[in-house]
Swiss-Prot record:
Cited HAMAP family: UPF0302 (MF_00760)
Top-level taxon of origin: Bacteria
Similarity comment: Belongs to the UPF0302 family.
Source species: Staphylococcus epidermidis (strain ATCC 35984 / DSM 28319 / BCRC 17069 / CCUG 31568 / BM 3577 / RP62A)
Protein name as catalogued: UPF0302 protein SERP1032
InterPro entries in the record: IDEAL_dom, UPF0302, UPF0302_N, UPF0302_N_sf
Gene3D superfamilies attached to this UniProt entry: Uncharacterised family UPF0302, N-terminal domain
Pfam family, one: UPF0302
Amino acid sequence: MNDSLIRIKQNFIEYILFNYRFKSRITVWVLNYLKANQDKLNNVHFVNSKINNHYTLEIAEVDATASAIQLSKDNKSYINTNQIFNYIANHTLRLDIQIHFANCHIRESRLDDLILMQLIHSPSYSSYVQDLYSISMDKRKQTFIIQTLQNNIDLSLQMNEPDYFYQLTQILNVLKSKDIQSTLHER
């Protein structure tokens, strides 16, 4: 994963630590630990919803309806805060982080931007492409992203990068599909 995506994740973590209050102090510890450890942060993916067979750290803002903090994979869950911190600190694992906000009706635009950046730069994008359906963006931003993707698709062809071409094409198709669906709902 590239250094700019790591910096974007670090900035996002700083942003949420500064602007939100979490139910568990261990959440703050884990986020600060991940922010300071680039190798760990490289394996972190922020998500909108849990994905089967992925380790998922669920964290909750004060007044959210979800549990304060929980680490789960398949049918196994950890709720002991010290156990969660130690597990993350002492294991090398791909970790999804799902944030439960108190006001679930308002989207956090910085999270949406991060999700999009992760999709564009992550080789494991296909596991997360469904998150595109839940991010919000206005028409102007969506048009800009589509144009940028099209330019990068052209560039990937010129650079003879078929995997990146395929990745960007899939993301572009989902964005266009999302646009068509939202247009149908508006009618």
